[in-house]
C-alpha cells in the first residue's frame, strides 16, 4: 500500500508539472488499459481506478461541474495530500529500517535520496493544489458557454498525464525493487555474519555443557539413588504402620459387632419375657369380662321371654 501511494502521487505530480498548453495536434490514441484481474498488483489496480476517475472528470458532466464549483475537488486533494505525506514518511522510515544491515555509506545515500524525494513531493503537491484552484477558476468562467475547448485541453492533458503516470510508476517500482533487494541482501549478509560470530560461542557452550554433564552427572545420579532408597524405606515404614492400624481397627470392629449381637439377644429375651408377663396379666381379665358379658346377655334374653304381652294403651 505504501509503494502504491508513492508511485501514484509522484507520477501524478510529474504529469501536472507539464505545460497545460501543450500541442493539441497530437491526437494519438490513449495507452491501452492495464488488466485489473486478481493477478495484477494493488498499485496497478489503483492506477486503473484513478484513470477511470480522470476519464469521468474529462466528461465535464453536471456532477463534475458541481464538484468543481463547490471546491469539493480541492478539499479532497488536501486530505489526500496529508494522508500521502503520512504514508510517505512511514514508508521512508520503514525502508530505512530495512536498509540498516547495509553499508553505512549506502544507507546514508538512500536515506538522503528518500528525504529529498519527500521534500519535493510536498512542494509539488502544494503546486498541484494551486494549479487545480486556477483550473477551477477557468471552469467557472467557461461554464454556461461552450465547453468544447476546455474538454479538448483536458483530453490532451490527460493523455500526457496517463503516459507519464505509467512511466514514472514503472520507474519508481524498479527503484523500490532495487532498494528492497539491497535491503534483503544486506540483511542476509548481516545474519550470516552474526551466525558465523555466534557459531564458536555455541560450540564452546555445547562443549562446556557436555563436560559439566560428565562431571556433575554421576554425583547427581548417586544422590538420586540414595534419595530413592531412603524414600522407599519410608514408604515401607508407612505401609507397615498403616497395616497395623487397619488390623487394630478390624479387631475393634469385630468386638463392637459381638457386643451389639449380645445386647440384641438380651433385648430380645427381655421383650419376650415382658410379652409373657403382659399376657399373664390381661388374659384372666379378658376371660372374666367374657363370662360377665355372656351372663348379661343370657339375663337379657331370659327377661325378654318372660315378660307378658300387654294390649296397647288407648293413650298411645
Swiss-Prot record:
Region spans: LDL and other lipoprotein receptors binding: 157-167
Major localization listed first in the record, in broad terms: secreted
Region (8 X 22 AA approximate tandem repeats): 79-254
Region (Lipid-binding and lipoprotein association), start-end ranges: 209-289
Residue positions, PTM Methionine sulfoxide: 142
Recorded GO CC terms: chylomicron; extracellular exosome; extracellular matrix; extracellular space; high-density lipoprotein particle; intermediate-density lipoprotein particle; low-density lipoprotein particle; multivesicular body, internal vesicle
PANTHER family linked to this entry: APOLIPOPROTEIN (PTHR18976), APOLIPOPROTEIN E (PTHR18976:SF2)
Compartmental location: Secreted; Secreted, Extracellular space; Secreted, Extracellular space, Extracellular matrix; Extracellular vesicle
SUPFAM superfamilies: Apolipoprotein A-I
Gene source species: Ovis aries musimon
Name of this protein: Apolipoprotein E
Glycosylated residues, chain numbering: 211
Binding site for heparin: 161-164, 228-235
Region (Specificity for association with VLDL): 277-289
InterPro entries, alphabetized: ApoA_E (IPR000074), Apolipoprotein_A1/A4/E (IPR050163)
Entry-linked Pfam families: Apolipoprotein
Swiss-Prot/TrEMBL Sequence repeat ranges: 79-100, 101-122, 123-144, 145-166, 167-188, 189-210, 211-232, 233-254
Function: APOE is an apolipoprotein, a protein associating with lipid particles, that mainly functions in lipoprotein-mediated lipid transport between organs via the plasma and interstitial fluids. APOE is a core component of plasma lipoproteins and is involved in their production, conversion and clearance. Apolipoproteins are amphipathic molecules that interact both with lipids of the lipoprotein particle core and the aqueous environment of the plasma.
Subunit structure: Homotetramer. May interact with ABCA1; functionally associated with ABCA1 in the biogenesis of HDLs. May interact with APP/A4 amyloid-beta peptide; the interaction is extremely stable in vitro but its physiological significance is unclear. May interact with MAPT. May interact with MAP2. In the cerebrospinal fluid, interacts with secreted SORL1. Interacts with PMEL; this allows the loading of PMEL luminal fragment on ILVs to induce fibril nucleation.
Modification comment: APOE exists as multiple glycosylated and sialylated glycoforms within cells and in plasma. The extent of glycosylation and sialylation are tissue and context specific.
Swiss-Prot/TrEMBL GO biological process terms: acylglycerol homeostasis; cholesterol efflux; cholesterol metabolic process; chylomicron remnant clearance; high-density lipoprotein particle assembly; intermediate-density lipoprotein particle clearance; lipoprotein biosynthetic process; melanosome organization
Phosphoserine modifications at: 146
